[in-house]
Structure formats: C-alpha cells, structure tokens
Amino acid sequence: RTFAKKKGSGYLINGQKIWTSRAEHSDLLLLLARTTPIEKVKKKTDGLSVFLIDLRKISNKHIQIKPIRTMINHSTTELFIEDLYVEQNTLIGIEGEGFKYILSGMNAERVLIAAECIGDAQWFINQASNYANNRILFNAPISKNQGIQFPISKSYAHMKAAELMVHHAAEKFDSGINDGESANIAKLLAA
C-alpha cells in the first residue's frame, strides 16, 4: 500500500505500513515501497524498492508514527506516510529489486526476534515463579502445588528447547550460512 513515485530528482512517497519495529525510537527507517505499478510487473514481489529514510529530518506532517501497544518488550508501530519527498540517494540498490534485498535479511531478523522472545519467556517464567513462591495460601506458598508447578515447569522446558534452537540458528548465521530452515524453526519455537 506504499507507493514511491518518481518526481524530479527523487521520489514522492504515500501510503501506510503496519507492524514496523521500533520506528518511534529510531533515527533511520528502511522503507519498502512499490515503485512500479503492480499491473506492470510479472510477480507481485517485482517493482518494490528500498529507501533509507532519516526520520530526524522528516516533518511529522509527512510521517505519522502510531504505537501499537499489544506486546510487552516489542515496540511495534504503524506508519502513515503522506507526500514524503526523498532524494534519489535514499534509494538502496537498484530500483525495483528491493524485495530481494529485504529477503536477504529475513533470516537474521527471525533469529533476532526469536532471541527477543526467549528473553521475554525468561522474564515471564521468573515472574510466575516469584509470584508462586511469594503467594501464601493456607499457610504455604502456592508453588508447593503441582497444579502450579507443572505449567511453569512445562513453560521452562519449552523455553530451553527454543533457546537451544535459537543458539543453533545464530551460530549458523555467524558462520556465514544463510539457513532459512533453522531461522524459521527458531522463531516458531520461541514465539
């Protein structure tokens, strides 16, 4: 839904994006926008371009950033872009090839998101354990009950298994192996 139209020595961008990570806390934004109308391309993924936008130089009237407050520890936003003019030098790579560039970074992003999810899980398990140990009912902490212990233990076991997969995927990435399977499994298990 975001289109960048050639204008002068640059592009005029209009549209909206949802599920954009950390835009409200960022100085720079990688923006994928359609530069060739969809009816003029063979595949839907053709005709997309990537732009590097310096948010510090953009007026709020051209980009509105609205937080989506649905997830703890994940600063997700929705962007509304209106008549944003950017120079040609903000284009990354070749016009129309942007989807390929974005795809090349997907595996790294999936491993990163999986690692964030592991951190979230550790925090929630710790919170649940502390609450169960400190909540006294009938003169004993509720953590003494199997009905409390088992779900926390099961969550911990799932988190540890996912953590191993995240480490495996990260090691492959660090070794220069672009392993989509490991990255996807890590994100699936950790999410």
Please give the residue ranges for each predicted region.
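Conserved hydrophobic/aromatic beta-strand scaffold that supports enzyme active sites
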Residues: R1-F3, G10, L28-L32, V50-L52, ...
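Short polar/acidic secondary-structure junctions
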Residues: K5, T36-I38, T70-M71
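Residue-level recognition of beta-strand microenvironments
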Residues: K7, Q16, T20-A23, I68, ...
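Glycine-rich phosphate/pyrophosphate-binding beta-alpha loops
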Residues: I18-E24, M71, A108-L112
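Alpha-helical interface subdomain recognition
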Residues: K6-L12, E78-D83, E97, S104-A191
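Cytochrome P450 core scaffold surrounding the K-helix E-X-X-R motif
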Residues: T90-E95
